[in-house]
Regions:
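Conserved alpha-helical scaffold segments that buttress catalytic/binding sites
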Residues: 1-291
Length: 291
């Protein structure tokens, strides 16, 4: 696997030496409101060179760790299933090589491809989901493969009690009714995350972490396809990431930056910092990092 031409800052390890591998899925063909998430991965990489590799929040530096950036997949915008198959194949390759796959979206549907790969290796997989939206619709305008349905499709893979949702503040009534029966849904913020993390640590179950950046309040992150008022702050998200990464996280993704929707550049800068902090939290040697 060869490195991308423009890598995320500090992620210049070789593939052989790396413990974490970045890969991008620039896909937004099912976006229901404002498109542009396909430009997210490239924007994050490009703008990262205005960011320091050092994190004052965690007193660690990206260059302390071995992280490889494999670049973006070439995905078929006309076929969601084809795109998901390509994402699954790349995630499976990284997992097979004993490394940690971290996916950059793209719209949230891309998560399904990565989860398909993860659940084949880890049948008892749990999913921790940060998002403004429940994403539990059975279909959206007749489409089963939609960013609005991604956690419903993931539920079909992992089953009841294996999906833990936080910051949810948008969805139709049927989604919340479904969640009450089949997932663990926490509205508005990260209340309950510390208790969940303790349970996940005790059980040592494998965990997939998916972060939709629209969990952030639009005042600090307006550049996303479906912004929702009332989100969490950057510091709240950082604290949540540092908390949940104590569990046995085996793969993760970061998605839904649409950089062209925020010409100030604030959203892209925020996404860069969230990615830096996530990489450091994952690779600081937490007991849970057990790929």
């Amino acid at each position: 696997m060869h490195p991308n031409v423009e890598t995320f800052i500090g992620c210049d390890s070789s593939y052989r030496a790396a413990s974490i591998v970045l890969y991008g899925a620039p896909y937004d063909s099912t976006t229901s409101y404002r498109p542009g998430a396909r430009f997210g991965p490239a924007a994050i990489r490009h703008e990262s060179y205005g960011l320091e590799t050092y994190s004052p929040y965690q007193n660690a530096d990206l260059t302390d760790f071995d992280i490889f950036d494999s670049g973006d997949l070439e995905l078929c915008f006309g076929s969601s299933e084809s795109a998901l198959a390509d994402i699954e194949a790349r995630a499976a390759e990284i997992l097979h090589d004993g490394k940690f796959p971290l996916l950059l979206g793209g719209e949230h549907l891309v998560t399904l491809g990565a989860v398909r790969a993860a659940v084949k290796k880890y049948p008892d997989l749990h999913i921790v989901h940060f998002d403004a939206h429940a994403d539990l619709r059975d279909d959206y305008l007749g489409a089963k493969l939609s960013h609005a349905c991604v956690l419903r499709r993931c539920h079909e893979l992992v089953g009841d009690g294996h999906i833990h949702q936080f910051c949810i503040r948008s969805g139709d009534r049927t989604e919340f009714e479904f969640a009450a029966q089949h997932t663990e849904l926490h509205k508005f913020d990260f209340t309950g995350l510390s208790e969940l993390t303790a349970q996940l640590c005790d059980s040592k179950v494998p965990v997939y972490l998916t972060i939709d950046l629209d969990c952030l309040d639009p005042s600090c992150f307006p550049g996303t396809g479906t912004p929702e008022a009332g989100g969490v702050s950057f510091l709240q998200l950082l604290d949540a990431i540092r908390t949940v990464t104590k569990a046995n996280i085996i793969a993760a993704d970061l998605n839904e930056l649409a950089p062209t929707l925020d010409t100030t550049g604030v959203s892209t800068a925020t996404a860069c910092k969230v990615l830096r902090e996530t990489l450091i939290a994952l690779d600081k040697g937490w007991p849970g990092f057990q790929v």
